[in-house]
């Protein structure tokens, strides 16, 4: 595309103080990425926590699942009164309803940057702040206090920056580095030979049911999926490292580290991420997981539309697609010239290029 789409934003363009004006405590900075990209069902933000600050007071959410991913620095996860040092590439997955109180505190020397993801907070959400009685009183006045939160044994740490008590050597089950669970086999669609990267499924490991999130490693010449659109669910892709082309309705936008692309459900915008560079690219890919029904449409794979049966989005909007066929350059070069005359023919032919015996996409 000649013009960068409004739903592609870099965290640097929307960063602002995390605390409201006049707040009693400085919580560093936040880039509200889903707000900038126009998504309403998800909350995705990048937090920048300077040394000696915390991202938020210790709290527990009744209904929200929370995912956090360390992009830079060495922040501490505060969980139920204990400190756990995190490193770049570590992720934290917290399921709903456990009552685990948590915070992110930067007790290190340099800035910490953390990617956080959950569903957007809904009316009726309940919150517990076990270390702050005045905050609990305020929550009660607002009708937001989670008064019957599970009682949990709390460690000695106060949850304030600079308090070094209660530091644990080991990691809780909620923390894992993405490389530890990265698949050793490439992902593919059923009955396809096209390799589409390695995945670390954080959501499956943590048994998350409301949000889906995984780390995806795309090698040169690979794409994250086939071009598609979703009827019901919002989704996003965030570039952790590397250079990619964001393909949207037949047009290409170069994206790099820190770029966020968010797609609203129902718009019919067909999309895929393509690695046409000479190095691996690492993505965070996520979205809603709680919809009972979701439907899809593949503009260049009519055979796939037939295969998915009731999940085919039959009355999808019909976009005016641009000239790009959605194929990585290296993959297109392997498609016979006679098949490259049509985007549909080229993509269907690419389905059967590659090696067999590889993990298939769901």
List the model feature ranges, each with a label.
Residues 1-41, 129-210, 295-348, 352-353:
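A short, N-terminal "cap"/entry segment at the start of jelly-roll beta-barrel domains
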Residues 22, 26-28, 34, 38, ...:
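Polar/charged low-complexity regions in secreted precursors and cytosolic/nuclear IDRs
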Residues 26-32, 45-62, 99, 195-199, ...:
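Conserved short histidine dyad/triad with adjacent acidic residue
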Residues 40, 80, 209, 247-249:
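Short strand-coil-strand connectors
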Residues 46-50, 60-79, 118-119, 215-220, ...:
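Short, conserved beta-strand element in jelly-roll/cupin
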Residues 81-97, 250-267:
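Short acidic-glycine-tyrosine-enriched beta hairpin
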Residues 96-124, 265-293:
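Ligand-binding loop in jelly-roll beta-barrel domains
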Residues 355-362:
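Intrinsically disordered, low-complexity polybasic segments
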């Amino acid at each position: 595309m000649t013009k960068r789409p409004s739903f592609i934003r870099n965290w640097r363009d929307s960063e602002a103080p995390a605390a409201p004006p006049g707040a009693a405590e400085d919580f560093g900075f936040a880039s509200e990425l889903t707000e900038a990209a126009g998504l309403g069902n998800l909350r995705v933000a990048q937090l920048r926590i300077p040394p000696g600050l915390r991202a938020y007071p210790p709290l527990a959410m009744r209904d929200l699942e929370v995912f956090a991913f360390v992009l830079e620095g060495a922040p501490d996860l505060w969980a139920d009164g204990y400190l756990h040092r995190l490193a770049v590439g570590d992720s934290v997955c917290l399921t709903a309803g456990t009552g685990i109180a948590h915070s992110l505190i930067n007790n290190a020397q340099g800035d910490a940057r953390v990617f956080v993801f959950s569903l957007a907070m809904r009316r009726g959400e309940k919150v517990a702040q076990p270390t702050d009685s005045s905050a609990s009183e305020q929550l009660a006045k607002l009708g937001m206090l989670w008064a019957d939160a599970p009682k949990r044994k709390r460690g000695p740490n106060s949850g304030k920056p600079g308090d070094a008590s209660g530091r644990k050597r080991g990691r809780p089950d909620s923390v894992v580095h993405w490389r530890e669970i990265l698949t050793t086999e490439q992902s593919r669609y059923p009955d396809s030979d096209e390799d589409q990267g390695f995945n670390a499924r954080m959501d499956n490991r943590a048994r998350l049911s409301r949000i889906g999130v995984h780390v995806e490693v795309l090698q040169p010449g690979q794409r994250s999926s086939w071009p598609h659109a979703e009827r019901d669910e919002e989704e996003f892709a965030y570039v952790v490292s590397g250079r990619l082309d964001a393909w949207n309705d037949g047009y290409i936008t170069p994206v790099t580290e820190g770029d966020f692309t968010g797609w609203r459900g129902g718009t019919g915008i067909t999309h895929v991420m393509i690695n046409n560079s000479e190095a691996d690219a690492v993505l965070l890919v996520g979205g809603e997981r709680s919809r009972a029904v979701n439907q899809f449409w593949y503009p260049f794979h009519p055979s796939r539309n037939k295969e998915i049966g009731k999940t085919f989005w039959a009355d999808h909007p019909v976009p005016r697609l641009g000239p790009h066929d959605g194929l990585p350059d290296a993959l297109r070069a392997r498609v016979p010239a006679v098949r490259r005359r049509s985007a549909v023919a080229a993509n269907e032919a690419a389905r059967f290029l590659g090696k067999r015996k590889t993990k298939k996409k769901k």
